Design a protein with these regions (language model features):
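Hydrophobic beta-strand signal
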Residues: 27, 33, 51-52
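Short, N-terminal intrinsically disordered low-complexity segments that are rich in Pro/Gly
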Residues: 9-19, 150-153
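Iron-sulfur-associated redox domains of electron-transfer enzymes in respiratory
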Residues: 40-47, 52-212
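Short beta-strand-turn/beta-hairpin segments enriched in glycine/proline and small hydrophobics
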Residues: 1-14, 41-44
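Short histidine-centered loop motifs in beta-beta connectors
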Residues: 16-25, 29
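Short, charged beta-turn/beta-strand-edge "cap" motif at the junction between a beta-strand
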Residues: 31-40
Length: 212
């Protein structure tokens, strides 16, 4: 049978700790490793049996039959959206794979702006307050060889926008901006059409330069 090797460090931060043992049967969606610090949950992607646990990976001997069914995420019924994101092990699509549950664990509401830093913004008055709080969606996809962000924007526009709304709800941001290169015409047009009735989500066009 095919062996599947799942690395214990699939993201920025520390390696995860295995929570299964050699000989354990696993299914698609079985939790197999949890963070020891900055990190995200890791799940089995196959039905099979844990055959080895090495320092940097878990090896699973995959079953010949691979049902489509998967194990649901184990969260309480009253779990918040942020708790669900953390439990699901969601990470960013960038190279660092930064854990989304950590990134969104912040209050961006305009009334919670923290301590004024004169060394960072010396030109601003000390009583300065933002009228709005923003989430910036980096859809620029600067690396010349990459296309997955733009592909998802085109093919799953509504899902992407729904995810942005979840992020706004979790962080209490009242505005969101898509930053996308104007050369990606199809993706830009899809976003503009999908957002035509949205007052709080806008599109900002970027020039085609690298690095951005």
């Amino acid at each position: 049978m095919e062996k599947v090797q799942l690395l214990l460090r699939q993201h920025v931060g520390a390696p995860c700790a295995p929570c299964v043992a050699v000989g354990d049967k696993v299914k698609k969606g079985t939790l197999i490793a949890t963070p020891t610090g900055l990190g995200a949950n890791i799940f089995s992607s196959v039905y099979g049996e844990v055959s080895e646990i090495l320092e940097d990976r878990i090896v699973i001997k995959a079953d010949a039959e691979q049902p489509d069914e998967f194990v649901p995420i184990d969260v309480p019924e009253d779990a918040s959206k942020l708790d669900m994101i953390k439990a699901a092990g969601i990470v960013g699509m960038g190279g660092a794979g930064f854990p989304t549950g950590i990134k969104l664990n912040i209050d961006l509401s305009a009334t919670e702006q923290g301590e004024f830093r004169e060394d960072i913004n010396p030109e601003l008055p000390k009583d300065f307050k933002l009228e709005h709080s923003y989430i910036l969606i980096n859809d620029s996809e600067c690396e010349p060889g990459l296309a997955h962000n733009i592909k998802q924007t085109i093919e799953q526009t509504d899902k992407v926008i729904r995810g942005v709304k979840y992020c706004m709800e979790i962080t209490k941001a009242d505005k969101a901006i898509f930053a996308i290169k104007k050369k990606n015409r199809e993706a830009v047009l899809k976003l503009l059409d999908a957002l035509k009735d949205e007052e709080n989500i806008s599109v900002h066009l970027l020039p085609d330069i690298y690095p951005m």
